[in-house]
Amino acid sequence: MKIKEKIVLAYSGGLDTSVIVKWLQNELNFEVITFTADLGQGEEILLAKKKAKLLNIKNIFVKNLKKEFIKNFVFPFLRSSSTYENNYLLGTAIARPLIVKELMKISYYLNTNYVSHGATGKGNDQIRFELGFKYFNPKIKIIAPWRIWNLNSRNSLLNFCIKNNIKFDSKTKKYSIDKNLFHNSYEGGNLDNINYEPDEPMWEHTLSNYNSLDYPIYISLTFKNGDPIKINNKNYNVEELFLKLNNLGSIAGIGRLDIIENRLIGIKSRGCYESPGASIIMYARKKLESLILDKEIYSFKEEIALKYSKLVYNGYWWSPERILLQKIIDYTQTSINGIIKLKIFKGQINIASINSINSLFNSKNSSFDEISNLFNQSDSSGFINIKSLRLII
């Protein structure tokens, strides 16, 4: 009897990856090993483990990666001040490299030649997964079911479940949802109609401005080397800190986004996102940067943030250029130390106060009402004459 090949599947516990398990077993005769990364999905993790057992999986791997996710992926990303196309905080894209890293550890440990994922042939995740797989093992063989099988609709997936005795939730989900500590994302379903306004129940993580608190919340954040370390002068570990800011931002209506984005393969898609904690951190740290960083460093960092965001979105987290940019970014953050007090209210974030020992702001130098010894104002005439040369010639 031929020994079955082993394959490690990135398993979420959802309909798609549950069908993939049985399809890999029945159609390709694989021994399937599942890996589920706990990045803050809550009860979905326990459900995924339970479903894997029902699918007769012998080797089920589940790992709590929440702290590593925030410390080694989210915080380095937030230091970059990057947003994709000036909007999206990349909560899905930033999670995929960690999932891949841990999955490939299992593949190496069990000496498997194959790995698999549940990303479709239209989206970005197929690229993010597979670039990572090849980075860790250039010889690995990848099975991407959505690019192979003929199960091309939800109905065909449900019929496959019935035929193969796979238990599933018969209640149709309106959207494709991805969750982690960083964000919630919603795609597909009614959102494919760009004139459809999302219904309020869709937003699981934040309150609307109408339903959010009727009074402002004041938050004091302490930063060290570009990362938040305290809330209201109280220390938290990275996971606790992010959860706390998520909760505070949620009840204040912070971090909702409804956008049209350009996928890597060229298709435009609509996505709705909730990132309350990340939005607060990004705002606060950028305000500290404006206070502390030299003008040219600040400008240069904004330029490389554009490149950085594209690399992360397009699946190049492990690329040498992303790693190089990270070193430059982290160097700029050594002086980003201070305390900023924020007022969050009805979806808005504003500064209440800001202080840093590394501040370059001097009220005497910038004030119209005080005389500064830093330079003679009459020197500006020569400066302007030089600057105007290219407009005169």
From Swiss-Prot:
Give residues annotated as binding ATP.
A10, Y11, S12, G13, G14, L15, D16, T17, S18, A37, G118
Q: Write out the residues that bind L-citrulline.
A: Y88, N124, R128, S176, S185, E261, Y273
> According to its record, what are the GO cellular component terms?
cytoplasm
Q: In which pathway does it act?
A: Amino-acid biosynthesis; L-arginine biosynthesis; L-arginine from L-ornithine and carbamoyl phosphate: step 2/3
What Pfam families is this protein classified in?
A: Arginosuc_syn_C (PF20979), Arginosuc_synth (PF00764)
Asked if the Swiss-Prot or TrEMBL record annotates the protein with the keyword Secreted, the reply is no
Top EC class of this enzyme:
ligase
Locations listed in the record: Cytoplasm
**What InterPro entries has UniProt attached to this entry?**
Arginosuc_syn_C (IPR048268), Arginosuc_syn_N (IPR048267), Arginosuc_synth (IPR001518), Arginosuc_synth_CS (IPR018223), Arginosuc_synth_type_1_subfam (IPR023434), AS_cat/multimer_dom_body (IPR024074), Rossmann-like_a/b/a_fold (IPR014729)
What are the protein's GO molecular function terms? argininosuccinate synthase activity; ATP binding
Could you list this entry's UniProt keywords, alphabetically sorted. Amino-acid biosynthesis, Arginine biosynthesis, ATP-binding, Cytoplasm, Ligase, Nucleotide-binding
Which BP terms does GO give this entry? Answer: argininosuccinate metabolic process; L-arginine biosynthetic process; urea cycle
Task: Look up the domain of life of the source.
Answer: Bacteria
| Reactions performed catalytically | L-citrulline + L-aspartate + ATP = 2-(N(omega)-L-arginino)succinate + AMP + diphosphate + H(+)
| Residues binding L-aspartate, per UniProt | T120, N124, D125
CDD domains from the entry? ASS
Oligomer and partners: Homotetramer.
Which HAMAP family does the record match to this protein?
Answer: Arg_succ_synth_type1
- Please name the NCBIfam families in this protein's record: argG (TIGR00032), PRK00509.1 (NF001770)
Query: Its family?
Result: Belongs to the argininosuccinate synthase family. Type 1 subfamily.
| Name of this chain's protein | Argininosuccinate synthase
